[in-house]
């Protein structure tokens, strides 16, 4: 990957992940480190691999250009034709990443893709070819964490089969504001139940110990986005104020504290 005719520490599987990461960091330029801080969306719906456009870019950069010229290695999947084509395209993208100076592999993430189609917008997608399940609120209605873990284990296998390594879920927000449009994507308003369901979700996707078969869960939206002011969502300009009526901040924080104590590696703050 480093293209110097020898195997560097970060390329050598005989070293620990910590040793490999530290060696890689020492070799990275400031620009390459900055590139790790971005997480733009990409669509795999069509076109050649160099024509797949970045949805967030007003300049029309191809994903190939973002990888090789702007050092961006994290991408959020927005749409896919089918699992087979998705796997092929993501493998092609990884081949492009190998051509970068350090050959840092890409980390591809996705919002939920397994829900029964309902037009989830920014909250969830329903991609063809993947198994179909209820929303988080539907799972919560079962009151059975073991069912949630079973779903997460199956979804993990499907994610891995196409090259997705980070799940931009679950939502551990508490649905205490009935006007908020994303309540269906939560585990409900009970902090204790939401905590239990979040742990089961995490255990199914990533396991108690992170390994090569794990899919990381990015629990969201820290520190608790359920009680949006007037029910307005902060994805939009009109929903910029986060409030906690009744001094209930600690109550909304509870599922996130439990997730962190359960070996959470990545977390998504609200906007």
Question: Residue spans of the language-model regions?
Answer:
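Glycoside hydrolase catalytic-domain context in secreted enzymes
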Residues: 1-271
